[in-house]
Amino acid sequence: MNNKIKPSILPGFMELLPKEQLVFNDIVSKITGVYEQNGFLPMDTPIIEKEEVLLAKSAGETEKQVYRIDNEDRKQVLRFDLTVPFSRFAAQYMSDLTFPFKRYQLGKVYRGERNQKGRYREFYQCDVDVVGNGNLSIKNDAFIINMASKALRKIGLDSYKFQISNRKILTGVLEGLNITNMQEVMILIDKYDKITEEQFLSELNKLIGEEKAKVISKVIKISGSSDEVVENLKKVEIKNEMLEKGIEEVEEVIKYLKLFGVEDSEYAINLKIIRGLDYYTGTVFETLLTGNESYGSICSGGRYDNLAQNYTENVLPGVGMSIGITRLFFVLREIGFIENYNSSLNEKYLIVPIGDTFEYCTKILNKLLVNGKSAEIYFEEGKLKKKLTYANKLDIKYVILIGEDEVTNKELVIKDMITGEQKKLNIEEI
């Protein structure tokens, strides 16, 4: 009887083999490098938070997806994003921070997502946020989208589009139509791309009636260039302060994006973008890969002016965005991007001793390491073919062969595993 347990992991969790993990780490390093270059400071928060802290502003779908820890003494939950813990952090350490406070954070988050392809229950997010004390310029909204642009370009992506909106626009329209069940309507609009047009209109008619549904449907379908969308929004017959403020803010964000150098082809105004999380108050955006829109957003964010009010009397408005690194990696792997990922990950050296040359090999190793190269010695015995196969399987580009002649002449033989080219070098030439 075989009583061995089959090694496996739970659905909704990602594990990578070392070759892919190296690429994953390289992507993270490039993204966080962009953040640091632009003045964002690193920080971290606990994976486990008090339930009353984490769920102070959450309801609906968000609360249903939270993982709770079974503990009789206190209610604890796993964080479902990095933004809410950041708001708690900003309120808790307010006297120690310099505002506007710009931070980035990489960490795992947990959501009880329905098990499906590309959706994970544990996943890495890589966030940037700016929080102000009392007020925060709208320029930051555009700057955050600019950070997303720089990060995606840094890892080699150039075919994507930021879908930008402002929650005040739809809130203003709904208020102008005297709609009371606003939250239900917002949730339905957020699902627009996941259901058919007929289903959407049918559900909307049930919620607010046919006449009002026609108005909402017409507004969210306004499209074209950013200038055209703004002009058409200004022609909407509903007039109120909330709607006008939303139009003004989205117009400003577009203006500053242009000044930051974000290309027109990188963004569009999409009034169907709501963002499911309950804390957004103004600018919201999602990011779709051009030609691969079915995979959903790879980078999302927005403005949250009231999130910290659950923890402090002080006004700490914020804006931020999150790149779902785990989801992004899955999508890039699916579309073949990872296969051809451009990095220096294979610029490695494997030193192979032939005969009694180990001492000399360690000198070569130390010289390479001092010069910032990635290198290792093959310690095990065996045929040369086996050692070269080892290098090939690990995508090691260069193999250095050290025999007794090389030790005598203070030389080495270096073999390029891609081209097959082999040449002798003096030790000083390394």
From Swiss-Prot:
Its EC number is 6.1.1.21. Keywords: Aminoacyl-tRNA synthetase, ATP-binding, Cytoplasm, Ligase, Nucleotide-binding, Protein biosynthesis. One of its GO terms (biological process) is histidyl-tRNA aminoacylation. The keyword Kinase does not apply. InterPro entries: aa-tRNA-synth_II, aa-tRNA-synth_II/BPL/LPL, Anticodon-bd, Anticodon-bd_dom_sf, His-tRNA-ligase, HisRS-like_core, HisRS/HisZ. This is Histidine--tRNA ligase. It is found in: Cytoplasm. NCBIfam families: hisS. Homodimer. It catalyses: tRNA(His) + L-histidine + ATP = L-histidyl-tRNA(His) + AMP + diphosphate + H(+). GO terms for cellular component: cytoplasm. It holds the Pfam family HGTP_anticodon. Gene3D superfamilies: Anticodon-binding domain, Bira Bifunctional Protein, Domain 2. Coiled coil: none annotated. HAMAP family: His_tRNA_synth. PROSITE patterns: AA_TRNA_LIGASE_II. GO terms for molecular function: ATP binding; catalytic activity, acting on a protein; histidine-tRNA ligase activity; transferase activity. Belongs to the class-II aminoacyl-tRNA synthetase family.
